[in-house]
């Protein structure tokens, strides 16, 4: 059995394979839908922390 992350529908599975400290392309973090991605970027939960 292959276990998939709960939020795999929101983000590519590659994100969950990253080791801490690796950089991701911004395009990989954003979903395909432009309307949904603009909602995510406005949401304070999904903003990048200042220490990144």
UniProtKB/Swiss-Prot annotation:
A GO molecular-function descriptor: structural constituent of eye lens
Keywords from the named record: Eye lens protein
Statement: the UniProt record of this protein carries the keyword Nucleotidyltransferase: no
Pfam families per record: Crystallin
UniProt-listed InterPro entries: Alpha-crystallin_N
Family: Belongs to the small heat shock protein (HSP20) family.
Oligomer and partners: Homodimer. Aggregates with homologous proteins, including alpha-A-crystallin and the small heat shock protein HSPB1, to form large heteromeric complexes.
Its biological purpose: May contribute to the transparency and refractive index of the lens.
Name recorded for this polypeptide: Alpha-crystallin B chain
């Amino acid at each position: 059995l292959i276990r998939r992350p709960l939020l795999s529908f929101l983000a590519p599975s590659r994100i969950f394979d990253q080791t801490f400290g690796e950089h991701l392309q911004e395009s990989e973090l954003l979903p395909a839908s432009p309307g949904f991605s603009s909602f995510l970027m406005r949401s304070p939960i999904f903003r990048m922390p200042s220490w990144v």
